[in-house]
């Protein structure tokens, strides 16, 4: 398995993967819209030979400054529970550190994301419409950014 940044030639395979994994096109359209808006900061694919078997996206938040949102993460059904998702999350965290990201937020299963260092208590300090036990954050900077509302990019508004 190879994990690398997406290429334009991967876009249709990413769209197909997201549609298949989520059973609808909403997440695939989200990634396309984030890309079109220039908000897609990190987009990695996991490949097995020529097949895209996983994808992770991190997008710029409007607030707090220097923050990213992890969404979506998808692994081909036949490859789930084999470490592909964990490898993508770890690679995305490394990539986020390389671009001086201060904090990453994700709305997801806390039992999954806490093993990578994500923390619900940290996320709870930041006002968000997604506040609750499934809203977690990972601090990458030496100090927490100033507390500010978590405001997602415009592409997320199109999900409603």
State where each predicted segment sits.
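Conserved acetyl-CoA pyrophosphate-binding loop and the N-cap/start of the following alpha-helix
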Residues: 79, 83-91, 101
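Conserved GNAT acetyl-CoA-binding A-motif
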Residues: 94-108, 121
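Conserved active-site tyrosine of GNAT-family acetyltransferases
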Residues: 113, 118
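Conserved acidic functional residues
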Residues: 6, 108-109
